[in-house]
């Protein structure tokens, strides 16, 4: 109850300022300097006044559409002294105003609470200052706003998103789009911003035989999901009804947001049925103008192409995505692991090289797998390989696979473990629950593709093992692969494979992902971890294959200096043209996204000179010729 009273008091105090304001500086939202065109920063430096105006305007013009404005605060703000504002508590309010603000503040508390499986504190703090507090920080610690958006519109329908988008466009607000906030590069947060939160849009609709708008071709069974549906919710529905989709390993990730629009990789299913974007049949999108459009091969094909790999929060807000479903068939899973001292050369030249050789051999037989490397201590590491024989529950074949694996590993003289099980459904092999992580645990990530040419070469497995032998990893770090090749690279010329992903994806055998832990919740530790990831670990990952520099944007280096080329390559030129067509004023902004080079680092100022953008455009044109 005390939290609610404090929250109401905060919101109520903010409204007092309304009486002293005739009109906020909405009509003059842009200021000019020698180097940039910026949002009106003075507006954001008095958030209590702006909050009052926003609540009033939402109450008067938006509440009739059911849009609720929420005040978003740090995870630990309810337990600590907030530095967001220093407002007086003397005022008078009507009962209806109190009711509105109680609802608003309760929403804000719920949306800001951290969860053990969402290590998001890294992108609440600033790059150089500890600007927010955490649930387990000292009780007397001050709480600041950090990179948490100031306000959030918790939407439940498409028309509510339209209202919120037009509101942001009209008042030139720095806009952030969020579903689960499951992002390791801070794309769903932003200082001094206005957030559209789509997590309540939970519609799931199955189609026996989907036909896209404007088409007379039946595309087979499919499922349409709302912007707030998670992979776990979709997996559960599919397990009940007998189908699966290509999705990631973490069930708390959103199904239609950044995961899908950034490409969508499965550790094993992509090898069989392609990337998630290869399976998209249609999007429903709210554009920067607030219009609703349907995008598929027949309607608005340009933005349909861009949304299949160009990244979330960039071209519009996807309110519904329709994708192919696949039979929830049986699968046999084989698991093998080796471990030993990190300085034991045999572990790398025989054990881990052996695992990569096994993976290569099984890939050539049409069986995908995932390699995982994790430290057990400062001196010991564990390497494991999980293989998925899909569309079979033949225990005899599984036993034969195990025997071939055993023969390879016994020749290494290293200790190993081996196990196998057959499951009636693929969905039984998918994770049901989220990661439960230590208190204040945060992560950042990096990734790189490995080409089929390298992986399938005679020296490929040994080369990978030797590259990883000296790869620096902390006690909570993790390195894992996602199996590409197969149907990711097959039939490249087919229309449904024409996505905006970097063309290198169609030439890759595996994606290597590195998860770098940030265990101490301070801006200093965050900055140190980011710099080490960028300057040390990512450099070593790119050195695996210097002439094949392609990365996965969804798990990319937050400090990536060549984003346009490593994420999109020759496709960037066309993506930028589509961005300018559908969002000419850059209402939608995504960190290291298409067009982001035109903005300053804090995302509040737009550079007057587009030299950097022109350079990226030129590099993309050159790359187009190389990949032809």
From Swiss-Prot:
What highest taxon heads this organism's lineage?
A: Eukaryota
Q: How is it used?
A: Ergot alkaloids are known for their toxic effects on humans who consume contaminated grains or livestock that graze on grasses harboring ergot alkaloid-producing fungi. Due to their strong affinity for monoamine neurotransmitter receptors they may also have clinical uses such as treatment of migraines, Parkinson's disease and cerebrovascular insufficiency.
Q: Specify whether Oxidoreductase is a keyword of the entry.
A: yes
Q: Mind listing the UniProt keywords for this protein, alphabetically?
A: Alkaloid metabolism, FAD, Flavoprotein, Glycoprotein, Oxidoreductase, Signal
Top EC category: oxidoreductase
Attached carbohydrates are found at 343, 382, 487
Q: Could you tell me the Gene Ontology terms of the biological process aspect for this record? A: fumigaclavine C biosynthetic process
Q: Name one GO molecular function term.
A: FAD binding
Q: What is its EC number?
A: 1.-.-.-
Co-factor(s): FAD
Residues spanning the signal sequence: 1-20
Task: State the Pfam families in the record.
Answer: BBE (PF08031), FAD_binding_4 (PF01565)
Stretches assigned to coiled coil? none
Q: In which pathway does it act?
A: Alkaloid biosynthesis; ergot alkaloid biosynthesis
Q: Which residues form the FAD-binding PCMH-type domain?
A: 144-328
Pros-8alpha-FAD histidine-modified residues are: 182
The induction field says: The expression of the ergot alkaloid synthesis cluster which leads to the synthesis of fumigaclavines is positively regulated by the brlA and stuA transcription factors.
Keyword check for Oxidoreductase: yes
- InterPro entries named among the record's database cross-references: BBE, FAD-bd_PCMH, FAD-bd_PCMH-like_sf, FAD-bd_PCMH_sub2, FAD-linked_Oxidoreductase, Oxid_FAD_bind_N
What job does the chain carry out?
Answer: FAD binding oxidoreductase; part of the gene cluster that mediates the biosynthesis of fumiclavanine C, a fungal ergot alkaloid. DmaW catalyzes the first step of ergot alkaloid biosynthesis by condensing dimethylallyl diphosphate (DMAP) and tryptophan to form 4-dimethylallyl-L-tryptophan. The second step is catalyzed by the methyltransferase easF that methylates 4-dimethylallyl-L-tryptophan in the presence of S-adenosyl-L-methionine, resulting in the formation of 4-dimethylallyl-L-abrine.
Q: Which PANTHER family match?
A: BINDING OXIDOREDUCTASE, PUTATIVE (AFU_ORTHOLOGUE AFUA_1G17690)-RELATED (PTHR42973), FAD-BINDING PCMH-TYPE DOMAIN-CONTAINING PROTEIN (PTHR42973:SF39)
Q: Which family does it belong to?
A: Belongs to the oxygen-dependent FAD-linked oxidoreductase family.
**Name of the protein described by the UniProt record:** FAD-linked oxidoreductase easE
Species of origin reads Aspergillus fumigatus (strain ATCC MYA-4609 / CBS 101355 / FGSC A1100 / Af293)
């Amino acid at each position: 109850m005390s939290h609610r009273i404090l929250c109401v008091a905060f919101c109520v105090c903010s409204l007092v300022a309304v009486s002293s304001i005739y009109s906020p500086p909405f009509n003059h939202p842009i200021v000019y300097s020698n180097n940039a065109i910026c949002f009106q920063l003075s507006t954001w430096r008095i958030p209590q006044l702006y909050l009052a105006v926003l609540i009033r305007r939402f109450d008067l013009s938006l509440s009739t559409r059911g849009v609720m404005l929420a005040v978003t605060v740090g995870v630990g703000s309810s337990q600590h002294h907030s530095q967001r504002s220093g407002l007086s508590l003397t005022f008078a309010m009507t009962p209806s105003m109190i009711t509105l603000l109680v609802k608003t503040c309760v929403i804000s508390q719920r949306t800001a609470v951290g969860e053990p499986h969402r290590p998001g504190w890294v992108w609440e703090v600033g790059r150089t200052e500890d600007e927010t507090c955490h649930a387990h920080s000292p009780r007397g610690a001050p709480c600041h706003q950090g990179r948490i958006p100031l306000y959030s519109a918790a939407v439940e329908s498409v028309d509510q998103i339209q209202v919120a988008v037009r509101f942001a466009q009209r008042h030139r607000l720095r806009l952030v789009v969020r579903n689960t906030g499951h992002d390791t590069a801070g794309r769903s947060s932003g200082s001094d911003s206005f957030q559209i939160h789509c997590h309540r849009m939970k519609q799931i609709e199955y189609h026996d035989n989907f036909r896209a708008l404007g088409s007379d071709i039946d595309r087979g069974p499919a499922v349409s999901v709302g912007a707030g549906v998670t992979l776990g919710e979709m997996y559960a529905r599919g397990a009940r009804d007998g189908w699966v989709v290509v999705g990631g390993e973490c069930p708390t990730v959103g199904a239609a947001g950044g995961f899908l629009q950034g490409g969508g990789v499965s550790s094993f299913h992509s090898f069989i049925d392609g990337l998630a974007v290869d399976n998209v049949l249609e999007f429903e999108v709210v554009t920067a103008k607030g219009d609703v459009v349907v995008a598929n091969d027949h309607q608005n094909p340009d933005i349909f192409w861009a949304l299949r790999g160009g990244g979330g929060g960039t071209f519009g807000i996807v309110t519904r995505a329709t994708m192919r479903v696949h039979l929830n068939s049986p699968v046999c899973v084989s698991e093998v692991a080796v471990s030993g001292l990190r300085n034991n050369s045999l572990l790398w030249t025989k054990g881990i090289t052996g695992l990569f050789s096994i993976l290569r051999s099984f890939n050539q037989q049409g069986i995908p797998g995932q390699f995982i490397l994790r430290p057990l201590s400062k001196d010991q590491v564990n390497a494991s390989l999980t293989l998925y024989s899909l569309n079979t529950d033949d225990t005899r074949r599984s036993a034969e696979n195990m025997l071939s694996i055993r023969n390879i590993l016994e020749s290494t003289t290293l200790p190993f473990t081996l196990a196998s099980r057959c499951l009636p459904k693929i969905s039984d092999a998918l994770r049901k629950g989220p990661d439960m992580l230590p208190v204040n645990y945060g992560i950042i990530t990096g990734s790189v593709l490995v080409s089929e040419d390298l992986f399938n070469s005679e020296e490929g497995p040994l080369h990978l093992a030797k590259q990883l032998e000296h790869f620096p990893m902390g006690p909570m770090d993790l390195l894992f692969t996602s199996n590409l090749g197969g149907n990711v690279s097959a039939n490249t010329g087919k229309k449904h494979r024409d996505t905006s992903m970097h063309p290198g994806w169609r030439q890759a055998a595996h994606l290597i992902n590195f998860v770098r832990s940030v265990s101490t919740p301070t801006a200093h530790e965050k900055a140190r971890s980011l710099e080490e990831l960028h300057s040390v670990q990512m450099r070593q990952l790119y050195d695996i294959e210097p002439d094949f520099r392609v990365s996965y944007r969804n798990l990319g280096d937050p400090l990536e200096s060549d984003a346009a080329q490593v994420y999109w390559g020759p496709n960037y030129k066309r993506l930028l043209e589509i961005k300018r067509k559908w969002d000419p004023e850059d209402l939608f902004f995504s960190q290291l996204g298409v067009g982001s080079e035109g903005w300053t680092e804090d995302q509040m100022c737009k550079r007057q000179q587009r030299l950097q953008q022109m350079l990226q455009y030129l590099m993309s044109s050159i790359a187009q010729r190389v990949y032809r």
